[in-house]
């Protein structure tokens, strides 16, 4: 990381600002009396330039990349390619080139560590002492209104101590304050707000300690106290401290007249009995544009030894303590704590990434070049990747390495097909022996699977995919970028010495040069090729030597010479001076190369056979079989010599290359065996195939999505997308022009890679299958758009629109199918010329047509109609003495083909066949036949006859048949008349097939036009008869979790049916059946997505009750399991009651933030009944107190009994046991998490959870064992306890 680059040092001012973390702890109490939002503006990551983006901009610079419209793809700069270590930032997808040294990065690590520590201190400060009870006082002049109307006898001392802590820790740091108590008449401590002094604080504490319990408070007393506090014009805010609950009458009065209170009312709930008071105080704060805080104590106060603080003559002794409490149900997560926690999580994540830069610095793509090498060494200025073979190169830049293969891209947008085995009851075989029904197993498939595109996976299984427009566009851009890189590599390999010699893999090379007399006309070219080979490849190797051989072999050096500038220049000069010799002593040259023990590879350049028998040479080669021999032939027409050279190369593991003189392309594709090019071309072929498959899947997904969701979402969105696909197919379907050029050039190097697809197609057998429901629908939708539009204007009903007119949805699907047809036809047009240009003049037309004729290419009309044809036969009826045929296919297959010889019938639907594509293919074939016919006739003409015709290129034979036949007759027919007639017959057959296809299309149009008016008359004749289409029930039978109205929790169940668009009938697992809004229903089970959870995600957490019914509660993920420890599989979540829970991944369902807020707002908690038995249990085990829920209080439950006194008592079902978990130390007491393991923790704690009894008032308690979570997952928290003796702050033990 100490690599120097452009200057990236930080200014001293920035460093001083970041080092200011050390100086931020001055006067923490006074400094922190601000909101978390303002605090983060001062000390957050962004303000101190410590976000990941800001740090990366200071230690590096972003790699430039922009979209070039003319090229149609993103283009990245290459000026810094390999010079800098790079870091990929996943948030915005940008790549940064790092230029900073390690010392600078260590400074950022230190600053981030200090920031994390500062955030932890802030969170501890917010959740300790008076801030836990009262929140944070943000204003400088306040009035505290005390409402003790709902206080219990044992809570007065606790309230006094809590208020004392608030006065000493927070009020002492503001300017003015006052205290008012709610009573029959408001009781003021002072008439107006008093400046804060030590004496005023001591007086206020003394006044608070003298407060007593007042039994009755008038309904208007609370409003009068708040209005009285608001009359003081100097105060900025009113802090309304409510102990217990507020009567319903006072709630209504306060909410009605809340706007009369002139100041914001900050409400503080202390020990609220139910969620009603919490909701009321939230509404009151919201109406007065203020904040809300809530606290509920859990244990008694614990007295600590007293200590004194002396300031002058004033001595004050008091017990400092911390309440051990919690947030009450319905209070939600504290916003000020959550903001700091979020910032701390971001700081931890950024710190981890920056630390990785120091621990394992990113390696640059290209190693640095030492410019101070020896003077005799060769200066290497090119990219070392040029020395790689294609296999190594593809390991870095191939599709799999870039994660651009089809299965890699589909991994995050596909899911497995869901099926299962169910029991079907059936009638027993022998009823006399068995009367009960037999159980048969049947495989059923999930209903929702039909709404997704089916695709086979690489392991043979079936998956469903859903490709979005953004996904398809992203993949298209990335794959084009990757293919362009491969295309540049192919072009580089085809240029220069690589095209003849291939890639040079070994370090010690011998080059044997044939200088026999037969090489006279080729020697200059061979010299140029060898010199080019030296300059481009050989200079990167270690040692080399040259041997020229004719009658005898002469070496340039006795042994291999080192690669340096002097030797390379001398070798080039020696090669230029080579002269022509006599014979070809190949064996002597090979022996010279074999004699050098350092030889690793031999390149043999020759144009003919050796002087010695080939067997003798091969026997010598077998002795040194471990040394590869790369043979290069300069006489491709000598098959015997080339066979010998191929055998030598194959025997030693080398390769055979050749240069064909007199040919425009010196390397015909059928002879190329270059493995480097083969791998690259296959990779490009795979890339184009994957891109085409991705576009096809996207088209199917778009059509499928529209088909099912058009009525719900509207057609406009899908119509725009499909129309854009049809109007601009070149943007998403056609490869770019440079891709086409690469395909063409690749043909010259490797057996026409883009023509292989057609060869595969011709081998593929045509499958004849019966029509399915989908194919019938597709065939009906392929009618003319104009007829469909006119029929729709006639106002036909939905019942028969499938037969008489196309709906908007069907029309757009038809347009999409036609677009796909056009795309494939363009591919046929683009590739057709490559297929039919194989015009070997030495092959007879009869043999040529066996490969490229209409029958061989399956281009007869019956081949085209086979996909939309069904064989049919008549049945003889003796009564009628006739052969009759079924009319069941008349609607779908309007035409029939009867064979004259066998009278066999084939039913045909022309609309089901792609006749337009078929006609284009036949036209392409006819062009190739005409081209061959014209060339054959032209070659047969003499030069004199060509001059008579006044033409310098082949002319059309069929248009000038008479003139050309006369010329051939004058030449005594140098070519066979049979050959011409065969090609002419093939051309006429193709034109006949095109005419018949056009007639079939016209017949289909007429059949459709004749059928439509009859269907319309039927509709007009029966105007009252309407067929109501039955909409599918999407949720019927679906396993879900649904909200229960009694307590707001989510319970498992099964949807029985959808009552309406917004409501569904759910059968709960506890036996009840209720109508639930679909917004409170979450599907579970089957092939549901299971995304990775991150800190801060919102989830439903499953709460398992051994003797009750499981349910789900909303929660937030606050900690992830340790990946390095296999046994730790628990996520830590913060439930809606601000308590932690430990759950496995299977017990969590990810939800959105809106759903989390909605679920929290509907969770209810009725008051706790005052049961002596319960209070006794709580006194014995107060550390594990739960807040039970009850269906109704005593008064409410008695009223229905008075209204229906004679109602007959029926045996009631076991009611839903309403319970909410509580955990004093972060674990779940009274309930067991889904994945708790009692074997790991042998000492479980016992908690008492109370459920309302069925059919009566009161409570029944059940003791439930709850195993605490692993201790390592919990941080040490602080708890507050209380007693009659005093107030203390103690750390909570786990």
Curated annotation (Swiss-Prot):
Cytoplasm as UniProt keyword: yes
Region described as Disordered: spans on this chain: 732-754, 778-803, 1012-1036, 1193-1247
One of the record's GO cellular component terms: cytosol
Keywords attached to this entry: Cytoplasm, Disease variant, Intellectual disability, Neurodegeneration
Pfam families hit by this protein: DUF4537 (PF15057), VWA_3 (PF13768)
Keyword Cytoplasm recorded: yes
Bias type Basic residues, positions: 1203-1212
Low complexity biased stretches: 778-787, 1213-1236
Bias-annotated ranges (Polar residues): 738-748
Main subcellular location of this protein, as a coarse class: cytoplasm
Highest taxon in the source lineage: Eukaryota
Reported disease: Spinocerebellar ataxia, autosomal recessive, 22: A form of spinocerebellar ataxia, a clinically and genetically heterogeneous group of cerebellar disorders due to degeneration of the cerebellum with variable involvement of the brainstem and spinal cord. SCAR22 patients manifest variable severity of intellectual disability associated with adult-onset cerebellar ataxia.
Name this polypeptide is given: von Willebrand factor A domain-containing protein 3B
Lineage: Eukaryota, Metazoa, Chordata, Craniata, Vertebrata
């Amino acid at each position: 990381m100490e690599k120097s680059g452009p200057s990236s040092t930080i200014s001293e001012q920035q460093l001083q600002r970041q080092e200011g973390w050390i100086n931020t702890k001055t006067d923490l109490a006074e400094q922190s009396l601000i909101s978390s939002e303002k605090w983060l503006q001062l000390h957050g990551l962004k303000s101190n330039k410590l976000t990941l983006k800001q740090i990366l901009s200071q230690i590096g610079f972003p790699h430039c990349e922009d979209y070039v419209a003319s090229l149609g793809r993103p283009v990245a700069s290459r000026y810094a390619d390999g010079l800098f270590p790079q870091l990929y930032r996943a948030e915005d997808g940008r790549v940064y080139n790092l230029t900073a040294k390690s010392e600078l990065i260590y400074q950022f690590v230190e600053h981030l560590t200090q920031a994390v520590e500062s955030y932890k201190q802030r969170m501890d400060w917010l959740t300790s002492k008076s801030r836990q009870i009262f929140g944070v006082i943000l204003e400088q002049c306040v009035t505290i209104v005390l409402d003790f109307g709902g206080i219990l006898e044992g809570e007065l001392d606790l309230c006094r101590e809590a208020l004392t802590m608030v006065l000493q820790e927070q009020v002492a740091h503001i300017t003015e304050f006052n205290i008012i108590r709610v009573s029959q008449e408001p009781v003021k401590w002072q008439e107006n707000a008093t400046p804060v002094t030590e004496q005023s604080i001591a007086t206020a504490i003394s006044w608070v300690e003298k407060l007593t319990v007042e039994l009755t408070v008038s309904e208007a007393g609370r409003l009068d106290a708040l209005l009285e506090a608001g009359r003081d014009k100097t105060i900025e805010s009113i802090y309304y401290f409510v102990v217990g609950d507020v009567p319903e009458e006072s709630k209504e009065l306060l909410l009605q007249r809340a706007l009369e209170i002139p100041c914001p009312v900050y409400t503080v709930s202390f020990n609220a009995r139910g969620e009603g008071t919490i909701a009321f105080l939230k509404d009151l704060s919201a109406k007065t544009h203020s904040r809300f805080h809530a606290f509920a104590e859990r244990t008694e106060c614990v007295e600590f030894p007293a200590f004194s603080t002396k300031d002058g003559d004033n001595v004050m002794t008091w017990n400092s303590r911390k309440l051990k409490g919690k947030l009450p149900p319905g209070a939600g997560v504290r916003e000020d704590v959550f903001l700091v926690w979020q910032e701390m999580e971001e700081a931890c994540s950024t710190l981890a990434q920056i630390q990785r830069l120091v621990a394992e610095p990113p390696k640059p793509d290209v190693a640095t070049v030492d410019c101070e090498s020896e003077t005799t060494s060769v200066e290497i200025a090119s990219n070392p990747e040029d020395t790689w073979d294609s296999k190594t190169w593809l390991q870095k830049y191939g599709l799999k390495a870039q994660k651009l293969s089809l299965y890699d891209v589909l991994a995050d947008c596909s899911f497995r097909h869901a099926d299962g085995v169910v029991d079907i009851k059936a009638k027993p075989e022998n009823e006399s022996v068995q009367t009960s029904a037999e159980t048969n197993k049947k495989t059923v498939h999930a209903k929702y699977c039909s709404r997704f595109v089916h695709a086979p996976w690489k392991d043979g299984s079936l998956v469903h995919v859903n490709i979005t427009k953004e996904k398809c566009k992203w993949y298209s851009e990335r794959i084009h970028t990757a293919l362009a890189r491969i295309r540049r590599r192919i072009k580089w390999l085809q240029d220069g010495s690589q095209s003849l010699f291939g890639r040079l893999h070994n370090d010690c090379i011998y080059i044997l040069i044939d200088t026999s007399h037969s090489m006279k006309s080729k020697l200059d070219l061979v010299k140029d090729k060898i010199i080019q080979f030296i300059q481009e490849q050989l200079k990167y190797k270690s040692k080399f030597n040259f041997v020229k051989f004719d009658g005898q072999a002469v070496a340039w050096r006795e042994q291999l010479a080192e690669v340096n500038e002097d030797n390379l220049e001398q070798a080039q000069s020696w090669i230029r001076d080579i002269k022509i010799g006599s014979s070809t002593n190949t064996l002597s040259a090979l022996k010279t190369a074999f004699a050098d023990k350092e030889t690793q590879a031999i390149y043999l350049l020759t144009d003919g056979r050796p002087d010695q028998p080939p067997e003798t040479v091969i026997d010598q080669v077998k002795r040194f079989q471990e040394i590869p021999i790369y043979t290069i032939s300069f006489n491709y027409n000598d098959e015997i010599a080339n066979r010998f050279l191929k055998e030598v190369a194959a025997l030693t593991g080398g390769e055979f290359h050749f240069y064909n003189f007199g040919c425009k392309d010196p390397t015909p594709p059928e002879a190329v065996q270059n493995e480097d090019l083969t791998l690259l071309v296959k990779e490009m072929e795979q890339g184009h195939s994957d891109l085409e498959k991705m576009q096809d899947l996207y088209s199917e997904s778009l059509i499928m999505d529209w088909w099912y969701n058009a009525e719900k979402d509207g057609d406009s969105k899908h119509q725009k997308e499909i129309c854009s696909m049809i109007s601009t197919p070149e943007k998403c379907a056609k490869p770019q022009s440079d891709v086409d050029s690469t395909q063409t050039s690749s043909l010259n190097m490797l057996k026409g890679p883009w023509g292989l697809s057609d060869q595969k197609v011709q081998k593929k057998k045509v499958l004849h299958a019966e029509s399915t429901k989908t194919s019938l629908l597709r065939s009906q939708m392929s009618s003319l758009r104009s007829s469909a539009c006119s029929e729709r204007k006639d106002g036909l009903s939905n019942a028969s629109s499938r037969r008489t007119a196309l709906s908007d949805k069907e029309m757009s699907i038809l347009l999409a199918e036609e677009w796909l047809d056009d795309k494939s036809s363009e591919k046929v047009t683009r590739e057709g010329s490559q297929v039919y240009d194989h015009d070997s003049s030495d092959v007879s037309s009869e043999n040529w047509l066996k490969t490229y004729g209409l029958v061989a290419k399956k281009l007869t009309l019956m081949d085209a109609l086979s996909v939309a044809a069904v064989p049919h036969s008549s049945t003889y009826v003796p009564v009628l003495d006739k052969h009759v045929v079924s009319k069941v296919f008349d609607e779908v297959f309007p035409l029939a083909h009867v064979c004259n010889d066998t009278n066999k019938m084939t039913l045909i639907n022309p609309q089901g066949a792609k006749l337009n594509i078929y006609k284009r293919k036949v036209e392409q074939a006819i062009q190739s036949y005409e081209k061959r016919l014209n060339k054959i006739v032209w070659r047969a003409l003499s030069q004199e006859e060509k001059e008579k015709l006044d033409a310098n290129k082949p002319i059309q034979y069929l248009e000038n048949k008479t003139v050309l036949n006369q010329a051939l007759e004058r030449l005594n027919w140098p070519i066979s008349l049979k050959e011409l007639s065969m090609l002419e017959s093939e051309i006429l057959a193709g034109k006949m097939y095109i005419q018949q296809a056009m007639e079939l299309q016209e017949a289909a149009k007429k059949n459709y036009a004749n059928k439509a008016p009859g269907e319309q008359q039927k509709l007009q004749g029966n105007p009252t008869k309407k067929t109501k289409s039955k909409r599918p029930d999407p949720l019927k039978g679906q396993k879900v979790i649904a909200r229960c109205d009694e307590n707001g929790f989510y319970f498992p169940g099964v949807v029985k049916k959808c009552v309406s668009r917004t409501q569904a009938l759910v059968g709960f697992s506890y036996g009840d059946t209720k109508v639930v809004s679909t917004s409170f229903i979450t599907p579970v089970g089957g092939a549901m997505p299971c995304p990775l959870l991150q800190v801060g995600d919102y989830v439903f957490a499953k709460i398992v009750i051994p003797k009750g019914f499981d349910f789900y509660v909303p929660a937030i993920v606050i900690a992830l399991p340790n990946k390095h420890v296999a046994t730790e599989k628990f996520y830590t979540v913060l439930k809606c009651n601000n308590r932690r829970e430990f759950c496995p991944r299977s017990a969590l369902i990810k939800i959105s933030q809106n759903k989390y807020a909605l679920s929290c707002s509907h969770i209810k908690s009725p008051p706790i009944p005052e049961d002596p038995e319960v209070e006794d249990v709580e006194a014995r085990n107060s550390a594990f107190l739960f807040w039970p829920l009850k269906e109704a209080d005593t008064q409410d439950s008695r009223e229905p009994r008075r209204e229906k006194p004679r109602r007959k008592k029926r045996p009631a079902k076991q009611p839903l046991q309403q319970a909410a978990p509580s955990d004093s130390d972060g674990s779940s007491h009274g309930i067991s998490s889904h994945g708790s393991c009692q074997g790991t923790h042998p000492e479980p704690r016992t908690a008492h959870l109370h459920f309302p009894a069925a059919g009566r008032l009161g409570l029944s308690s059940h003791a439930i064992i709850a195993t605490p979570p692993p201790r390592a997952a919990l941080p040490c928290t602080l708890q507050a306890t209380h007693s009659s003796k005093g107030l203390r702050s103690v750390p909570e033990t786990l």
